[in-house]
Each structure stands twice: as structure tokens, then as C-alpha cells.
């Protein structure tokens, strides 16, 4: 198995190369499905990622709140069962805070390379937090067109502040504030998803660690311009092992979802947060909620940046199927976050192909 260190993709992109190294070229069977992401995003025909409006879900008016929660329950349930991904709008996190998070991340990646390298991780020794590029850890030595910055942002007592960027100065306060708001949003979503399964509101959150143990890990994905985007992927097809994944981006398209046997490009919805259902929730829901296979395309015109926050149970947490209503399948097996996830394609509960991916597998 190949475990060589990848070069910084940003350096390759800025070097003026016209052809990408062979390690970044996808297998022939994948190339036929990689199109121009800007043209793909313009398409209005065919299935579209659903949008869920959370406005007034916490209204002080009890009647309004009840009506909104019932609507959101049905819409979230439908989106989670059919897609496993959705755009959240009116989610309660201010545009100002989201902009601060984005500006801080963009500013960090605009620093000189020698400054970013001060925060470099050491994947070979198991130190995955920090600035890095994906290791070639499959048999072919294949690489993805991406650099990243990864670190745990919540709970507060588990943060390693020594690896948080000191520049820009707003990186720490913006990220800390965002983590608190996002943790609150996760509670709201898990509550509604629990109700959609016929469970009490707090059941799913309890199963993934509760307020005290659920981890929020942030990965800023930086996809430089690519001279041959038709041959490469920013991130290859995978599902997330998280419970939920929340994603911001810089309004450059690139996210694709594998839906009904085809790759669907997510549109750029202003002021939205993209949310994925992760493998953990698929397990807890006995496969009723779907962890969707997804990937990231690149382009030659614009840098794409996304901010993914993985909401994960602690590694020692045993994940069991939850009792979904009365006629749920009996608990028969479990998955533990202690067990390593293979870096290969496997089959999900719905029979579709997937490559299991964890933010700890970078």
C-alpha cells in the first residue's frame, strides 16, 4: 500500500503546469461522469437538492412553533429519507458570523506558503490536526486536488488551541462563536429528525453523545484552480461517518450527490448551510435516513473553498440501531468509532456503492 506524502496542491496549481501529475488523474470509469461544473450547476431539469426553511422553528408563539416544527419534521424526514442532504435556510446563524468564518478561512489560505506550513500536520505519525494535503493511501497512490486545514472546534475543553491559526486575528473568535451556534443548530436538527422516526425529541442526540460528548470537527477544504478539471476530483466519492455534516462554501459550485444512479450538482443557494446525513444517523435510523454518496469537482477558473463541520460521537461510543416506532427491527449489530473504516468502496444499507470516509482519514 502506498503512503507517500502529497505535495501541496496550491503549489502545483500556481506553478503554471498545463498537465496534472498522473497521481491526480481519475480512473477511466470515473472520467465519463466528470463534466463542467459551471454548466452542470446551471441545469434546472432533473432532481434538485431540497431546501428546508427553518424560520420560526423556535418561535415564542407556541401555536406558530408547533405548526413550523410539524412542517419541518415532515420536510426534514422526507429529505433525509430520499436524499440524505439538504440546503438549510433561515437556520438562525447570522450572515455576519458566517461571513466572518469565511473571511478568516480565506485569509488563512491566502497567507504565504511558509506561514501556512507553520501549522502543518504530521499524518505519518498520526497527528492529523492542522494544515495538510491528502496522503496517497490507496493501492494506486491516487491523490485528490485539495489542501485543507482540520481541527476540533467543540467542546471547548477538547480544543487544542496551539494548532489554531493566529492569523487572521478573527480566526479564533469567529470559529469559537460559530461552533456554539452550530452546536445549537445540531440539537434542533437532531430533535426534529428524532420526531420523524417516532422517537422522543432528545433520543438521537443522546445516542450520539449528548451535549457533553458530541464532537464538532472542522475541515476547511481548499480546491485550487486545476488546469485539467475534467481529469481530477477535489474529493473522491465517499459518505461521511459523522452523525451530521454542516457545510459552508464560497459560492463556487462543486458538490455533487449520487442520486438515483446519477451525479447531481448542488446549486449555490445564498445564505444557506448544506447539511448531510452521516453514516451514524443512517445506522441509528435503521437505514430510514440515508447517508448519501458525494464528491467534489474542481475547475480551472475559480478557487473553491468549503467549510465542513463533522458532528461526531466520541471515538469510544458504540452506535446501535435506535428503536424506530414499535415495529422497528431488533438490535442485531453495532458499529464502533473505535474500529477503522476501510478506504475502499463498500455497499450501504440501500445497496448503493460508497467509500467510507472519516475526517480522521485525511
Curated annotation (Swiss-Prot):
Fe cation binds at residues 238, 240, 294. InterPro entries: DIOX_N, IPNS-like_FE2OG_OXY, IPNS-like_sf, Oxoglu/Fe-dep_dioxygenase_dom, Plant_2OG-oxidoreductases. Binds 1 Fe cation per subunit. Binds 1 ascorbate molecule per subunit. Induction: By light. Keywords: Dioxygenase, Flavonoid biosynthesis, Iron, Metal-binding, Oxidoreductase, Vitamin C. It holds the Pfam family 2OG-FeII_Oxy. Its EC number is 1.14.20.4. Its cofactor is Fe cation; L-ascorbate. Residues 211-313 form the Fe2OG dioxygenase domain. GO terms for biological process: anthocyanin-containing compound biosynthetic process. It catalyses: a (2R,3S,4S)-leucoanthocyanidin + 2-oxoglutarate + O2 = a 4-H-anthocyanidin with a 3-hydroxy group + succinate + CO2 + 2 H2O. Coiled coil: none annotated. Pathway: Pigment biosynthesis; anthocyanin biosynthesis. GO terms for molecular function: L-ascorbic acid binding; leucocyanidin oxygenase activity; metal ion binding. Belongs to the iron/ascorbate-dependent oxidoreductase family. Oxidation of leucoanthocyanidins into anthocyanidins. This is Leucoanthocyanidin dioxygenase.
